[in-house]
């Protein structure tokens, strides 16, 4: 139950009358510890304590060095406050709490105020290959101006190829896979049932023939089940959010692969997709 001012006054009055703390706590339905807190403050000041949201310690003023440090780190990595806290600790050996960082991001205009309180996230089971290049996810995406083709390594989340085209075609899909193959031998390719990847008539296509020629097994997602290709779908959200910050796609690819830590990887050491790609590379016999 909530401790209101009328209940607080009644609780203190009963304590003055000789009630025990256990008896007085039942008036407002609060803990014995809380009754002792307000009773001790009343005895020290001889006044009914103020209660409410705005009676705590005043917020500490944000200093300029904190603003500069958060701005510099965000513009370099473009990640959430929780990740920025770790990056600032690593890069500058300074500690700024993530709640304070979020407050600074709001001031700088790099974040939006949340409309509701965060809900604690549940742990989830993540399905991924153990080794790099065991499987890749591919798909097309239209951002309103450009057709985007991406090849994402399943194990490391590394972006192996990125094309920005004026149309989504089989030829461009093959071109994108050829770029990805420059990273090494790919075993499996996971895609949806897009016309660029299969034939709607008999299931055969030039793209499928290309994969067979390269010794790559094609795995098709279940129809109307985008979660099967969720890694690349989630990556397109990152593309839409951050691509406009970079002048060229090469700069964007370098930022994503080599600078931005990925939470699905070894986050304790702020591992990037490029680092995970090397770590998870299977040693050849």
Predicted region positions:
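Short, amphipathic alpha-helical "recognition" segments used to contact nucleic acids or chromatin
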Residues: 2-19, 67-76
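Key DNA-contact positions within bacterial/archaeal DNA-binding proteins
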Residues: 22, 33-36, 99
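Short alpha-helical "recognition helix" segments of helix-turn-helix
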Residues: 23-28, 84
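Basic, flexible linker segments flanking DNA-binding modules
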Residues: 49-69, 73-135, 205, 272-278
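Mobile-element integrase/transposase regions
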Residues: 94-95, 99, 103-158, 166, ...
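Acidic/histidine-rich, metal-coordinating catalytic segments
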Residues: 177, 181-201, 222-224, 229, ...
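RNase H-like two-metal-ion nuclease catalytic core shared by retroviral integrases
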Residues: 197-241, 273-275
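C-terminal domain-tail junction helix/linker
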Residues: 214, 237-285
